[in-house]
């Protein structure tokens, strides 16, 4: 049996979109994101060189379905290329005996913030004091765990108290935030996503991190709004994921999703939080920041923290007591 390695070089702001495209067609939704690094001369630590392009990879079984999947990926890249610089799709054939190591070589241990360390599950890592280690398997867009929107969330999470809290991770993706909350001391985490692949990935990553009794991953959304607000075009049909309605239930809500979704869910965030509860939001492009700020101000959420990285903004808000 043979495999096809598909790769494309993009700028940092296109990584998440290309990763989501590759996850739709790649084997088991697996995506590898290879960022340029600046190694340290004195330690195994390194920094990401954000000024250099990023390589995004996925893999296909070389069977009769591969040609159609490759065509769909090429079409998707063409559309994305209308908005951001996207390189040509590169395709390489890999023999079965080389497959096991071909995809693993593009993953490495990565420190985010002061405490979080993301470690591919097959690598060994000796944690330092106060490290919070997240062992993750590649699944739906694993590489987006390194995306600025996720980094901002993890950094903001380090600033609040999680011991004995009840947490909602909305749009859980790979489950990195849900598992992070559990590792920081949360007693119960509900992880919701409208994509069943994301729900499976979150459940698996919770298991790998021995957090399966703390993290519950379900397919669904939050509140009363129509579910089409989750996608980037109007009138999209998402099938029938359940819409969950919670009142004064969560100490913390984590939501790394589209800015337009944050705008729609302002009232639902407020309703779901306990008095004094904390909302961390990311996935907000600079151009949509004012919309999100206005929506949250309108419902009475109090801004506590604002952070930026590149073109992205993240917030911490609090529900009044």
Curated annotation (Swiss-Prot):
Keywords: Cytoplasm, Methyltransferase, S-adenosyl-L-methionine, Transferase
Keyword Methyltransferase in record: yes
Annotated localization: Cytoplasm
A Gene Ontology cellular-component term: cytoplasm
GO annotation, biological process: methylation
Catalytic activity: L-lysyl-[protein] + 3 S-adenosyl-L-methionine = N(6),N(6),N(6)-trimethyl-L-lysyl-[protein] + 3 S-adenosyl-L-homocysteine + 3 H(+)
EC number: 2.1.1.-
Protein's UniProt keywords contain Cytoplasm: yes
Signal peptide from the UniProt entry: none
UniProt: S-adenosyl-L-methionine binding residues: 150, 171, 193, 256
Source superkingdom: Bacteria
UniProt GO molecular function: protein-lysine N-methyltransferase activity
Pfam families according to UniProt: PrmA
Listed CDD domains: AdoMet_MTases
Family: Belongs to the methyltransferase superfamily. PrmA family.
General function of this protein: Methylates ribosomal protein L11.
Protein name per UniProt: Ribosomal protein L11 methyltransferase
Gene label: prmA
């Amino acid at each position: 049996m043979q495999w096809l390695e598909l790769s494309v070089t993009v700028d940092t702001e296109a990584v998440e979109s290309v990763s989501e495209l590759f996850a739709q067609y790649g084997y088991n939704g697996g995506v590898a994101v290879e960022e340029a690094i600046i190694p340290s001369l004195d330690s195994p630590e390194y920094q990401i060189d954000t000024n250099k392009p990023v390589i995004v990879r996925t893999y296909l079984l070389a069977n009769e379905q591969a040609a159609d999947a490759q065509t769909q990926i090429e079409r998707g890249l063409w559309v994305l290329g209308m908005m951001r610089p996207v390189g040509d799709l590169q395709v390489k054939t890999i023999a079965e005996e080389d497959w096991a190591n071909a995809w693993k070589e593009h993953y490495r241990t990565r420190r985010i913030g002061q405490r979080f360390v993301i470690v591919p599950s097959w690598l060994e890592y000796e944690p330092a004091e106060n490290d919070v280690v997240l062992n993750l398997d590649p699944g739906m867009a694993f590489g987006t765990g390194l995306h600025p929107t996720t980094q901002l969330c993890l950094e903001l999470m380090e600033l609040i108290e999680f011991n004995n809290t009840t947490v909602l991770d909305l749009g859980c993706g790979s489950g990195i935030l849900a598992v992070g909350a559990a590792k920081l001391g949360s007693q119960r985490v509900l992880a919701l996503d409208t994509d069943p692949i994301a729900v499976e990935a979150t459940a698996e990553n919770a298991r790998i991190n021995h957090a399966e009794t703390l993290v519950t991953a379900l397919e669904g959304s939050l509140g009363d709004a129509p579910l089409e607000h989750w996608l980037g075009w109007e009138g999209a049909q998402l099938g029938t994921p359940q819409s969950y309605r919670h009142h004064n239930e969560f100490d913390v809500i984590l939501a790394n999703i589209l800015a337009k979704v944050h705008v729609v869910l302002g009232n639902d965030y407020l309703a779901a939080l306990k008095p004094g509860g904390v909302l961390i939001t990311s996935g907000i492009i600079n151009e949509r920041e004012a919309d999100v700020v206005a929506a949250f101000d309108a419902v009475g959420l109090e801004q506590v923290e604002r952070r930026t990285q590149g073109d992205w903004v993240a917030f911490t808000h609090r529900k009044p007591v």
